[in-house]
C-alpha cells in the first residue's frame, strides 16, 4: 500500500537549499551530524521504538521535496519507517571511530525521495555505544536537533521502564510556519523587503576578498576546520545581557558580529 503525502509550500529557506541541491548535485555540505556517546546498558529494541515514536511526532522528519509547476513544495508522508542501522566497532581505535562517523555523515541525501534522517548506532562494547543522527539542513538545524534528542530520550526512558512518555502536544509544525511565511511575504511586504536589499546591496562585491594565506581554489571544495576559543565569563555575561535586551538568541548576536567582521572586506 502506498503512503499518502500531504503537500505544503516550502519555506524560502527550504527553497534556497533545494535550489543549491539542484544546482550543485548531491552533496554532504548541508548534512547535520550529531553524535552522542552512550554509556551503560542499551536496549536497541527500545531505541527503535523511540525513533518510531519521534518520526510521527515531527512532520519535518517525514518530509521530502518536489517541484509543483514552478514552485518547490514539501511532501509530508503520512508514515515513514526510519530503521536504526547498527554497526559493530568493538575494539576500534578513536581514529577508526572518527573515520567511520565522518563516512556515515558524508553520505548525501535524496531530497526528492527521502528520508532525510538517518539513525546509526555504533556498538563499541557491551555498555558503550555512539548514537549518530544525520539530517539534511533543509528539515533541521542545531536547535531542532536538540529537541529531537530530548524527545528520543523521553521516549526511550519511558519504553525501557514500561512507562508512558509524557510529551506535550505540538500545536505548530514547520509546514505551518512555511504557510504563514508565504502569506506574510505575499505582495507588498515582499516587494518592500526586496527593495530594501536591492538598495543596500547595490555595488556589493560578488566575492569577499578575505586576507587568506593561500590562493582561493577555482572550484569550491568545502574543506574546512574548526577553531574553538572560550570567552571570559565577564564577556559572556555581557553578551547574554545584550542578546536579551535585543530580543535575540546568543547565536543571532554572534552571527551578526561575524557578518559585521566580514563586511570589512
Tell me the role of every PLM-derived stretch.
Residues 2-78, 91-184, 192-211, 248:
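Acyl-group handoff/entry surfaces in thioester-processing enzymes
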Amino acid at each position: 500500500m502506498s503512503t499518502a503525502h500531504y503537500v505544503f509550500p516550502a519555506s524560502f529557506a527550504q527553497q534556497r537549499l533545494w535550489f543549491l541541491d539542484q544546482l550543485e548535485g548531491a552533496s554532504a555540505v548541508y548534512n547535520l551530524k550529531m553524535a552522542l556517546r552512550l554509556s551503560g546498558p542499551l536496549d536497541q529494541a527500545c531505541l527503535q521504538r523511540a525513533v518510531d515514536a519521534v518520526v510521527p511526532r515531527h512532520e519535518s522528519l517525514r518530509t521530502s521535496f518536489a517541484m509543483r509547476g514552478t514552485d518547490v513544495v514539501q511532501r509530508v508522508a503520512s508514515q515513514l519507517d526510519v530503521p536504526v542501522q547498527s554497526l559493530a566497532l568493538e575494539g576500534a581505535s578513536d581514529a577508526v571511530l572518527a573515520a567511520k562517523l565522518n563516512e556515515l555523515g558524508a553520505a548525501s541525501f535524496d531530497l526528492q525521495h527521502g528520508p532525510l534522517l538517518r539513525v546509526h548506532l555504533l556498538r563499541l562494547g557491551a555498555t558503550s555505544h555512539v548514537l549518530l543522527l544525520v539530517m539534511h539542513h533543509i528539515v533541521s538545524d542545531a536547535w531542532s536537533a536538540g529537541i529531537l534528542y530530548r524527545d528520543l530520550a523521553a521516549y526511550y526512558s519511558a519504553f525501557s521502564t514500561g512507562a508512558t512518555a509524557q510529551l506535550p502536544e505540538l500545536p505548530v509544525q514547520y509546514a505551518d510556519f512555511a504557510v504563514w511565511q508565504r502569506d506574510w511575504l505575499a505582495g507588498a511586504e515582499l516587494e518592500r523587503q526586496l527593495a530594501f536589499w536591492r538598495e543596500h546591496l547595490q555595488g556589493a562585491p560578488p566575492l569577499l576578498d578575505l586576507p587568506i594565506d593561500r590562493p582561493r581554489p577555482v572550484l569550491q571544495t568545502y574543506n574546512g576546520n574548526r577553531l574553538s576559543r572560550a570567552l571570559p565569563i565577564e564577556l559572556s555575561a555581557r553578551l547574554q545581557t545584550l542578546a536579551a535586551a535585543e530580543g535575540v538568541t546568543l547565536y543571532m548576536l554572534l552571527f551578526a558580529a561575524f557578518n559585521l567582521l566580514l563586511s570589512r572586506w
